[in-house]
Amino acid sequence: MRHRKSGRQLNRNSSHRQAMFRNMACSIVRHEVIKTTVAKAKELRRVVEPLITLAKSDSVANRRLAFARTRDAEVVGKLFTELGPRFQERPGGYTRILKCGLRTGDKAPMAYIELVGRPEAAEAVEDTAE
């Protein structure tokens, strides 16, 4: 029975899953939007949102915790200098999942996962309005 077991297995062993979500979390912090399957996007929220909450209060201890979870100094720098201050007033819900159809090869449901309030999104809306 799988009672009280949270999270999805995604047909991977635990180390592969941990490495995959670590890499995806680094990618979403760098690019602020990535395209992936819906199941992976929903699981990625559980990794990224606590990182951003950690970045809202800048301290050496929090930077070390973020580095332990991402293993990327560039990503930790962006988290604490850009994303933490940007989401200072928001009490959670830092990501948005937008479904975007099915993948060509295997019809897997795909989605964009993006950070809420990213600057590029506002510019794109203005361009399409003109």
Curated annotation (Swiss-Prot):
It comes from the Bacteria. The keyword Oxidoreductase does not apply. The keyword Ribonucleoprotein applies. One of its GO terms (cellular component) is cytosolic large ribosomal subunit. Keywords: Ribonucleoprotein, Ribosomal protein. GO terms for biological process: translation. It holds the Pfam family Ribosomal_L17. One of its GO terms (molecular function) is structural constituent of ribosome. Belongs to the bacterial ribosomal protein bL17 family. NCBIfam families: L17. Part of the 50S ribosomal subunit. Contacts protein L32. This is Large ribosomal subunit protein bL17. It comes from Shewanella pealeana (strain ATCC 700345 / ANG-SQ1).
